From Swiss-Prot:
It comes from Caenorhabditis elegans. PANTHER family: CYTOCHROME C. The keyword Heme applies. GO terms for cellular component: mitochondrial intermembrane space. Residues 1-21 are annotated as: Disordered. The lineage of its organism: Eukaryota, Metazoa, Ecdysozoa, Nematoda, Chromadorea. This is Probable cytochrome c 2.2. GO terms for molecular function: electron transfer activity; heme binding; metal ion binding. GO terms for biological process: mitochondrial electron transport, cytochrome c to oxygen; mitochondrial electron transport, ubiquinol to cytochrome c. Electron carrier protein. The oxidized form of the cytochrome c heme group can accept an electron from the heme group of the cytochrome c1 subunit of cytochrome reductase. Cytochrome c then transfers this electron to the cytochrome oxidase complex, the final protein carrier in the mitochondrial electron-transport chain.
Length: 123
Protein backbone atom coordinates (compact mmCIF):
# COMPACT_ATOMS: atom_id res chain seq x y z
CA UNK A 1 0.00 0.00 0.00
CA UNK A 2 1.42 3.33 -1.03
CA UNK A 3 4.88 1.89 -1.72
CA UNK A 4 5.67 1.50 -5.38
CA UNK A 5 7.77 -1.53 -6.20
CA UNK A 6 9.70 -2.76 -9.22
CA UNK A 7 10.22 -6.38 -10.13
CA UNK A 8 13.59 -7.91 -9.24
CA UNK A 9 15.46 -10.44 -11.32
CA UNK A 10 14.44 -13.13 -8.84
CA UNK A 11 10.75 -12.30 -9.24
CA UNK A 12 10.51 -10.34 -5.98
CA UNK A 13 10.08 -6.61 -5.73
CA UNK A 14 12.38 -3.67 -5.08
CA UNK A 15 10.97 -1.48 -2.32
CA UNK A 16 10.51 2.17 -3.33
CA UNK A 17 13.10 3.31 -0.79
CA UNK A 18 13.40 6.29 1.54
CA UNK A 19 15.53 9.23 0.41
CA UNK A 20 16.51 10.37 3.93
CA UNK A 21 17.54 6.87 5.00
CA UNK A 22 19.44 6.53 1.73
CA UNK A 23 21.27 9.80 2.42
CA UNK A 24 22.50 8.41 5.74
CA UNK A 25 23.64 5.17 4.10
CA UNK A 26 25.44 7.15 1.38
CA UNK A 27 27.25 9.28 3.96
CA UNK A 28 28.27 6.22 5.99
CA UNK A 29 29.13 3.77 3.21
CA UNK A 30 29.74 5.62 -0.08
CA UNK A 31 30.77 9.24 0.40
CA UNK A 32 34.41 8.48 1.14
CA UNK A 33 34.82 7.28 -2.47
CA UNK A 34 31.92 8.80 -4.46
CA UNK A 35 30.11 12.11 -5.00
CA UNK A 36 26.63 12.56 -6.45
CA UNK A 37 26.34 16.34 -6.69
CA UNK A 38 29.35 17.14 -8.88
CA UNK A 39 31.29 15.74 -11.83
CA UNK A 40 34.54 15.29 -9.91
CA UNK A 41 35.86 11.83 -9.22
CA UNK A 42 37.37 10.62 -5.97
CA UNK A 43 38.61 7.08 -5.38
CA UNK A 44 35.45 6.09 -7.25
CA UNK A 45 33.67 7.79 -10.16
CA UNK A 46 31.00 10.44 -9.74
CA UNK A 47 27.50 9.03 -9.44
CA UNK A 48 25.96 12.18 -10.90
CA UNK A 49 23.87 11.07 -13.86
CA UNK A 50 24.49 7.38 -13.14
CA UNK A 51 20.90 6.34 -13.88
CA UNK A 52 20.79 5.49 -17.57
CA UNK A 53 24.59 5.50 -17.96
CA UNK A 54 26.55 2.45 -19.09
CA UNK A 55 29.11 1.02 -16.66
CA UNK A 56 32.68 2.23 -17.03
CA UNK A 57 31.82 5.46 -18.86
CA UNK A 58 32.77 8.43 -16.65
CA UNK A 59 35.36 10.44 -18.60
CA UNK A 60 38.70 10.65 -16.85
CA UNK A 61 38.09 7.80 -14.41
CA UNK A 62 40.41 4.77 -14.59
CA UNK A 63 37.98 1.84 -14.56
CA UNK A 64 38.91 -1.82 -14.45
CA UNK A 65 38.55 -3.69 -17.75
CA UNK A 66 35.79 -5.73 -16.09
CA UNK A 67 33.75 -2.62 -15.38
CA UNK A 68 34.27 -1.18 -18.87
CA UNK A 69 33.39 -4.48 -20.52
CA UNK A 70 30.32 -5.33 -18.42
CA UNK A 71 28.15 -3.13 -20.61
CA UNK A 72 25.37 -2.83 -18.05
CA UNK A 73 23.16 0.26 -18.10
CA UNK A 74 22.50 1.45 -14.56
CA UNK A 75 18.86 1.57 -13.48
CA UNK A 76 16.98 0.60 -10.30
CA UNK A 77 17.22 -3.11 -11.06
CA UNK A 78 20.88 -3.24 -12.06
CA UNK A 79 21.91 -1.05 -9.11
CA UNK A 80 19.81 -3.20 -6.76
CA UNK A 81 21.56 -6.36 -7.96
CA UNK A 82 25.03 -4.74 -8.05
CA UNK A 83 24.81 -3.22 -4.57
CA UNK A 84 24.06 -6.63 -3.03
CA UNK A 85 27.53 -7.89 -3.99
CA UNK A 86 29.57 -5.72 -6.38
CA UNK A 87 32.41 -8.24 -6.79
CA UNK A 88 29.97 -11.00 -7.73
CA UNK A 89 28.04 -8.76 -10.15
CA UNK A 90 31.22 -7.48 -11.86
CA UNK A 91 34.07 -9.92 -11.17
CA UNK A 92 37.31 -7.96 -11.40
CA UNK A 93 35.84 -4.60 -10.32
CA UNK A 94 38.17 -2.32 -8.36
CA UNK A 95 35.34 -1.36 -6.01
CA UNK A 96 36.21 -2.54 -2.50
CA UNK A 97 32.70 -2.10 -1.09
CA UNK A 98 31.38 -5.46 0.16
CA UNK A 99 27.76 -4.61 -0.60
CA UNK A 100 24.49 -4.14 1.27
CA UNK A 101 22.77 -7.41 2.06
CA UNK A 102 19.46 -5.87 3.23
CA UNK A 103 17.05 -5.15 0.37
CA UNK A 104 15.53 -2.16 2.19
CA UNK A 105 18.96 -0.54 2.62
CA UNK A 106 19.75 -1.02 -1.07
CA UNK A 107 16.37 0.45 -2.02
CA UNK A 108 16.93 3.45 0.28
CA UNK A 109 20.39 4.07 -1.19
CA UNK A 110 19.06 3.78 -4.74
CA UNK A 111 16.26 6.27 -3.96
CA UNK A 112 18.86 8.77 -2.69
CA UNK A 113 21.04 8.22 -5.76
CA UNK A 114 18.02 8.59 -8.09
CA UNK A 115 17.06 11.92 -6.51
CA UNK A 116 20.53 13.42 -6.09
CA UNK A 117 22.21 12.08 -9.24
CA UNK A 118 19.44 13.56 -11.40
CA UNK A 119 20.25 17.10 -10.20
CA UNK A 120 22.47 19.41 -12.20
CA UNK A 121 26.07 18.93 -11.00
CA UNK A 122 27.82 21.72 -9.10
CA UNK A 123 31.04 21.46 -11.16
Amino acid sequence: MGKKKSDTASGGAIPEGDNEKGKKIFKQRCEQCHVVNSLQTKTGPTLNGVIGRQSGQVAGFDYSAANKNKGVVWDRQTLFDYLADPKKYIPGTKMVFAGLKKADERADLIKFIEVEAAKKPSA
